[in-house]
Amino acid sequence: MNIFENHKIKNSLQIKSSCRFYVEINNKNEFNDLHVFISNKKLPVFILGEGTNIVPPEYYDGIIIKPLFNNIKYLNEINIVSVGASINWHFLVKEMVSKNIYGFENLSLIPGTVGAAPIQNIGAYGQ
């Protein structure tokens, strides 16, 4: 887990923004440390993907959590895939098509990450 204080928030609109704490988590083993950190600080928390579809404030007096879960695991031969939340959505679509795993290729070119897909309501794009 990496913790940065007074860190810039990158976003697709290139709005200048920063936050009090920016925390990168690399794997699920760091969740306990993250929980302790959040509990001790008693600040609002926001989970950030790639910074698309957000309009950040000039300064966020809280904790930004940036998951760095960039893994793709093929679990068996019947097209079951486990995907990390930080994977870019369009990259995932291209990767699945390249592996002959079909079904959501019409959802290509949508900005954001896999973890943000439910919040961004990606399914509303026609699938």
Residue ranges and their predicted role:
Residues 1-125:
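Anion-binding (especially nucleotide phosphate/pyrophosphate-binding) glycine-rich loop
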